[in-house]
Design a protein with these regions (language model features):
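Sequence/structural signature of beta-propeller domains
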Residues: 22-391
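Bacterial N-terminal signal peptides that target proteins for export
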Residues: 1-9
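Alpha-helical transmembrane segments
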Residues: 12-16
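C-terminal motif of bacterial Sec signal peptides marking the signal peptidase cleavage site
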Residues: 18-20
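Low-complexity, compositionally biased segments in intrinsically disordered regions
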Residues: 385-424
Length: 424
């Protein structure tokens, strides 16, 4: 039986209209990924006894931490500049579940090696290549570790990024960017405020390294009333060590006024951590004399802001900083003590599939401070798929709905998850 034209139009027009309403998943996916935030649920706290002996060394000064998921193992980097014992890192097991965190079990100590295979000396040895270890990251693709040293302005030692084997044997050193070389006087990086944070992209192809604070050329030190200059965060190719991109991040002003008012106070970036291929967690730590430490975690998207890799001096108007969103202010935890936290890493997943987030503090080998581990559950909104409404194809299985070709055939709703961008 021939269908009238009006019936054909009645069935085709709605289908075409529905198809015209289809969503482009590549466009909406990127925006949705950037808009997604996270929240943290506090799990618990654990501490390590002051000056505990591990493998014949004094444990302390932990400035970096990373998690080896395959081995269920943590790497803890000490910032001891070979003053107490040769520069080193520790391996440890840390039991974490949804209800708490247990005291870490130290397993071994590994000394950092120079290119000739010897250990690093300290000031007492009158060494000229004293390291200042700060950040450590495990790269599963090569079963190796990256670590940073802040350098020393007085000794003329530049901040560096190095790769080593799990036994501490040095593999290589990344090429040095001229802008991060130590300079005399008030130019170049500020002393002890250089390569403090580091994180690898999930695919291991690139590594981000953050300055703790602004270079002299880029801005001032922070105050209680005014933020300091921008800290540069640089993306390097993991294999070549060459820089790819650089963004500018604006740390907060110092949140608490010191007591007395002219007392010591600062604020900077001790650590960064990739949440996924583009989103990054940034830890800000401040200290105010007479008040103590303050910690805040921010979420940024590394695609935001301008690329400042080739901008020699950052001034308002010649760059766009990345935007940041507050995830947590540790003041809200009401802990008995909040110490000098410098390390941040993901830990094991909980039974519900959520990741854990672990922080560790640097006690500076002082009796008045503690090595504090804080564990959190990471709660992320579940990704929402883009739905594309399409007209049915010619092979539409009408029998499933009853053979009624004179009725408008039902449209197909096809879920298409947001594509995950990858770094080439």
């Amino acid at each position: 039986m021939r269908r009238p034209i009006k019936f054909l139009l009645a069935s085709l027009v709605p289908a075409l209209l529905l198809a015209g309403c289809a969503t482009n998943p590549s466009d909406s996916g990127a925006d949705a990924a950037k808009a997604r935030g996270i929240s943290l649920r506090f799990i618990g706290e654990a501490t390590v006894p002051h000056r505990a002996l591990v493998g014949g060394t004094t444990f302390g000064g932990i400035s970096g931490i990373d998690y080896d998921e395959a081995r269920d193992l943590y790497y803890l980097l000490s910032d001891d500049r070979s003053d107490h014992n040769p520069a080193r890192f520790y391996t440890a097991k840390i039991a974490i579940d949804a209800k708490g965190i247990k005291t870490p079990e130290m397993l071994s100590v590994v000394t950092l090696k120079k290119p000739d295979g010897t250990t690093y000396g300290g000031k007492a040895d009158k060494a000229t290549d004293i390291p200042d270890p700060e950040a450590i990251r495990y790269r599963a693709e090569t079963d190796t570790l990256f670590w940073t040293s802040e350098g020393d302005k007085k000794l003329g030692l530049d901040p560096v990024i190095r790769e080593m084997k799990l036994d501490g044997t040095m593999i290589r050193e990344f090429p040095k960017l001229p802008m991060f070389r130590m300079q005399p006087g008030d130019s170049g990086p500020r002393d002890n405020l250089t390569f403090e944070g580091m994180t690898l992209t999930p695919d291991g192809k690139a590594v981000w390294v953050s300055m703790e604070a602004a270079r002299f050329e880029d801005g001032i030190d922070p105050t209680v009333d005014k933020p300091g200059g921008p800290a540069r965060i640089t993306l390097y190719h993991s294999n070549s060590g060459n820089p790819i991109r650089q963004i500018a991040y604006l740390p907060d002003a110092i949140p608490h006024r010191p007591m007395p008012p002219n007392g010591e106070a600062d604020n900077g970036i001790p650590e960064i951590l990739m949440l996924d291929q583009f989103r990054m967690l940034v830890l800000e730590r401040s200290y105010s004399q007479g008040v103590g430490n303050s910690l805040r975690v921010y979420l940024i998207d590394t695609r935001d802001g301008s690329d400042v890799l080739n901008v020699p001096v950052l001034r308002e108007g010649n760059y766009t900083p990345v935007q940041k969103r507050l995830v947590i202010n540790f003041d809200s935890l009401n802990l008995m003590k909040l110490d000098n936290t410098e390390g941040m890493t993901f830990g094991p997943r909980l039974p519900n599939g959520n990741r854990t987030l672990v922080f560790v503090s640097d006690d500076n080998f002082r009796k008045s401070q503690i090595t504090q581990f804080l564990a959190f559950e990471v709660i992320e909104p579940k990704p929402v798929a883009s739905y594309i409404v399409e007209p049915p194809p010619y092979w539409w299985p009408y029998p499933y709905y009853g053979y009624r070709p004179w009725l408008f055939p039902r449209p197909i709703i096809v879920p298409r998850p947001h594509p995950r961008p990858k770094l080439d």
